[in-house]
């Protein structure tokens, strides 16, 4: 389909605090046709929740936001911040012009000033109920990516029965050194994070103190 080849979507995330969120985010990226998931800063994450979708998704890593921005601009790609700002446009208005990378903010504090500086425009997700001030980052990403796919004219995936057909995994796969935590450790991590509400999805203060870069074989560079 012409539009599918013409436009691409990317997801951009910066200095992950909740590493296991990337697994569920990767699942949404594959469902909505994202070309690449770009990590900036920290790159150690857990594939928990991805249901194998990381095998069908391209990853890329940069050490700084400026390098990520340069990469995207070389591909004539806009950077869209998903944030409620004075000039943000409702995502259902589809204010897209070309291939777009979506930068998602902290569920508690939103995008930092540094992150906002690299954005070309902003979208927000209208809410119609009064019980919450924000959405989980993966839920927000899914809504925004779906709207972009509709605007870009992406082809709907073939269905079989009550599910969509999953493509075969690539025969040649790079080494994927996922953070090999157990389900129990993830549950415990989530419990501790709930007790410490200051931890958000992005956290500029988080230091990567892992003994090695856990995904050296996963990223294009």
For each of these PLM feature ranges, what is it?
Residues 1-221:
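Post-transcriptional modification and biogenesis factors for structured RNAs
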